[in-house]
UniProtKB/Swiss-Prot annotation:
Keywords: Ribonucleoprotein, Ribosomal protein, RNA-binding, rRNA-binding. This is Large ribosomal subunit protein uL10. Part of the ribosomal stalk of the 50S ribosomal subunit. The N-terminus interacts with L11 and the large rRNA to form the base of the stalk. The C-terminus forms an elongated spine to which L12 dimers bind in a sequential fashion forming a multimeric L10(L12)X complex. CDD domains: Ribosomal_L10. The gene is rplJ. Forms part of the ribosomal stalk, playing a central role in the interaction of the ribosome with GTP-bound translation factors. Gene3D superfamilies: 3.30.70.1730, 6.10.250.290. The keyword rRNA-binding applies. GO terms for cellular component: ribonucleoprotein complex; ribosome. Pfam families: Ribosomal_L10 (PF00466). It comes from Oleidesulfovibrio alaskensis (strain ATCC BAA-1058 / DSM 17464 / G20). Coiled coil: none annotated.
């Protein structure tokens, strides 16, 4: 590989790493191309990206950036998953993919510059995703006005029942 090609790969990796709050280093040794393609598709669906890269190029690209804590841990065959939208969704996609593949392993990762081992990444994958949290927050915010409207409607209904009872009482007398 020419020096200019290496520089281009390093710049591309650096751009991905700087834009991504999460980076996860995986082992893909012995995986067929079809399985890697399925992994890439699954990650794209969850807002991520998967790159197979030489260890030295990854070390250079990650040095001095958000995921600097990863640079000293690269060994053997590595692939790096970057997630730019929802870190939890990327972690979930990787953990789910690992369940279906005997050759795929999650080694370690970085979330906003904090080193995460595979057990911490498993715990991250169990958290609710961004969309789920937004839905819960909106549901909670929507509950207050809904409850107010129901309370007000009940007050009006009870007031009307009281007026109707008074009217019936006067008509009977």
């Amino acid at each position: 590989m020419k020096r200019s090609e290496k520089a281009a790969i390093i710049e591309q990796l650096k751009a991905k790493a700087d834009a991504a709050p999460i980076a996860v280093v995986t082992d893909f040794k012995g995986m067929p191309v079809e399985e890697l393609t399925r992994l890439r598709v699954k990650l794209r669906e969850s807002g991520g990206d998967y790159t197979v890269v030489k260890n030295t190029l990854a070390r250079i690209a990650l040095t001095g950036g958000t995921h600097d804590v990863l640079k000293d841990n690269f060994s053997e065959n590595c692939g790096v998953a970057f997630g730019s939208e929802d870190p939890v969704a990327v972690a979930k996609a990787l953990v789910e993919f690992r369940k279906g593949s005997k050759l795929f392993a999650i080694r370690f990762g970085s979330l906003e510059g904090q080193f995460l081992d595979d057990k911490q990444l498993d715990a991250l994958a169990k958290l609710p995703g961004k969309q789920e949290l937004l839905a819960k927050a909106l549901g909670t915010m929507n509950a207050v006005p809904t409850n107010f409207v129901c309370l007000f409607a009940n007050l009006l209904r009870n007031f009307l029942y009281a007026l109707k009872a008074i009217q019936e009482q006067k008509e009977a007398a």
